[in-house]
Amino acid sequence: RCLHCMEIYQDEFDVCPFCGFVEGTEPEIAYALPPGTVVADRYIIGTVIGAGGFGITYVAWDTKLEIKIAIKEYFPTGLVNRIPGTLPISLTGRNNEPVYQKGMQGFIDEAKALAKFNESSGVVNVFDCIEENGTAYIIMEYIEGQTLKEYVSINQPDCEVVEHSESVSTRKLSIEESLQIVQALLHTLKLIHGEGIIHRDLSPDNIMILKDGNIKLIDFGAARFFAADTTKSMSVVLKAGYAPVEQYSRSSRQDQRTDLYAVGVILYQLLTGKLPQEAFDRVTEDRLILPSEIEKTIPDWLDSVVVK
């Protein structure tokens, strides 16, 4: 079985005829689990799909259900390490133990938060959460599709892509398609906000566009529960360019409006191909440019919706 696309092919071939993956290719991330590793006597680990500051996500194969899945491993860089080719992780310092354990509990809480929405078409499905190799793993569905960031890039190939810049154009979509995507996103957010959960890390990287055109929200690693009648101190977790000013402070109150601000930024970016001025910078000098000043076809009413 190919450890990249998980298709079956004859043993005499070293190159997968379906995706071109070469058997025995070293992992791009040295500290990632070696392809072919079996977790919980059931899940065959494949190649890395993505990696961030708190975890590594792999494509995998469920030998019991015989389906392709995704597995997210708790791996906070800076706190832990792994000898290449081995399975257990080790702390980079003994003093890291409390922080690591607290983070792993938060990782497990992420799985529980996601599992609440397994009946929803707008949130990635979670099948299980297990602990092994000194860490934890979230077993979830493998989504056939692309991130919103990738989707915009592919559908508008003639424009330059530049990260987090308010002065240089990224790619953009039509008004109609931009509104369709944002409306679907708002529908999903209404569900998770109804359970008292805020995502806190919304961006085109965490929105998947499926082959049928629907969307799924992924990566709830920064998600937190909120109470409408209380003020709670929260850790500073934010996505630069998409975060409201209150997200820069541990003591500021955060609620569903934190996510709604990010939705406004995403809509602004889809319509104009640019990111607006960051919220924190606007506190000292508000230089926000209206979407219609960048893209003349945008009507005034849509300006009001975006900047509200």
Per-region residue spans from a language model:
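Conserved short submotifs of the Hanks-type protein kinase catalytic core
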Residues: 133-147, 151
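Activation segment signature within eukaryotic-like protein kinase domains
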Residues: 181-182
